[in-house]
């Protein structure tokens, strides 16, 4: 589960390495984010020459969580790290590559561009 002040690894080549969650979008009572949820975050670490810089406020979608998620068929999936992909206003990724696997739940949230760029969908 991702909550306010959580730090996430960035799984794309937008220039950010680590982000810190400011807000989870989706209503005032939403406390935690899971796979496929959109968050507002600030960049804490960035690579030089990237699209985003340290201190930028960005929107991102959660693609991997340690907490995991249950699926309707009864299976359960969780990852070794918490990771997100930085997105623009039109839900398209700011980077051109996605690193590591992403969950199949992103298809339900209309993040098909992220799913198509990912090397593996679990």
From Swiss-Prot:
User: What does the subunit section of this Swiss-Prot or TrEMBL entry state?
Assistant: Part of the 50S ribosomal subunit. Forms a cluster with proteins L3 and L19. In the 70S ribosome, L14 and L19 interact and together make contacts with the 16S rRNA in bridges B5 and B8.
Name the CDD domains on file. Answer: Ribosomal_uL14
Q: Which GO terms describe its biological process?
A: translation
Q: What does this protein do?
A: Binds to 23S rRNA. Forms part of two intersubunit bridges in the 70S ribosome.
- Protein name, per record: Large ribosomal subunit protein uL14
The record's Pfam families line, in alphabetical order, gives: Ribosomal_L14
Keyword line: Ribonucleoprotein, Ribosomal protein, RNA-binding, rRNA-binding
GO cellular component entries: cytosolic large ribosomal subunit
**Keyword DNA-binding appears in the UniProt entry:** no
Q: Which InterPro entries match?
A: Ribosomal_uL14, Ribosomal_uL14_bac-type, Ribosomal_uL14_CS, Ribosomal_uL14_sf
Similarity comment: family membership: Belongs to the universal ribosomal protein uL14 family.
GO molecular function terms here? large ribosomal subunit rRNA binding; structural constituent of ribosome
> SUPFAM superfamilies under this entry?
Ribosomal protein L14
């Amino acid at each position: 589960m991702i909550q306010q002040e959580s730090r996430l690894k960035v799984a794309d080549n937008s220039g950010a390495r680590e982000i810190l969650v400011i807000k989870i979008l989706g209503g005032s009572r939403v406390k935690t984010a899971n796979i496929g949820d959109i968050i507002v975050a600030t960049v804490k670490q960035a690579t030089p020459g990237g699209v985003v810089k340290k201190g930028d406020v960005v929107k991102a979608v959660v693609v991997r969580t340690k907490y995991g998620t249950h699926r309707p068929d009864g299976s359960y999936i969780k990852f070794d790290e918490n990771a997100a992909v930085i997105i623009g206003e039109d839900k398209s990724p700011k980077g051109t590559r996605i690193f590591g696997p992403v969950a199949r739940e992103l298809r339900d949230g209309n993040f098909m561009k992220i799913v198509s760029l990912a090397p593996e969908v679990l």
